[in-house]
Amino acid sequence: MYYAKKGVLLNPRKGIYTKPKYNEQELACTLLSPSYISLEYVLARAGVTFQYSSEITCISYQNRTIEVDGQAYVFRKINPMIWANMLGIEQRDNIAIATPERAFLDMVYLSAGQCYFDNLHPLNKDLVRQILPTYNSKILTKRVEALLKE
């Protein structure tokens, strides 16, 4: 494309063009679509985990890491029946982002319970329990209930 060759637009991935100053969250949801921002990215900003990560972590239909301008976008695959359910996912300004409660459930689901959370107090436990049936997993339910009791 003419504007990409001239440097007016960036071409981070085939078929995707952005202005030089772009919203990284919006780009994350565009790079691999459909997807939504979740996991460590959301949990760190909510104060549930204290580990810093510069990666923008997303849920999608496949595992992939894409780097654009030094920013890593990490996509984790999850069952399509789960990511297709929009419960606990906020949609605004071309950005789909999980609530901290949904990100917590995504993390426990994908890590098979092998994850650590620094502070579960920011989570709305009623909302966690409301979203939990989306995953249709008795094992996940047991793990989540054990974590919420701690």
Question: Can you describe what each PLM-predicted range is?
Answer:
Residues M1-I37:
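Short beta-edge/loop segments at beta->alpha junctions of small alpha/beta modules
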Residues N23, N79, V108:
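A broadly conserved detector of short glycine/acidic/proline-rich loop/turn motifs that flank catalytic sites
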Residues T49-E101:
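Exposed, interaction-prone assembly regions rather than primary DNA-binding/catalytic cores
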Residues M86-E150:
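Hydrophobic alpha-helical interaction segments
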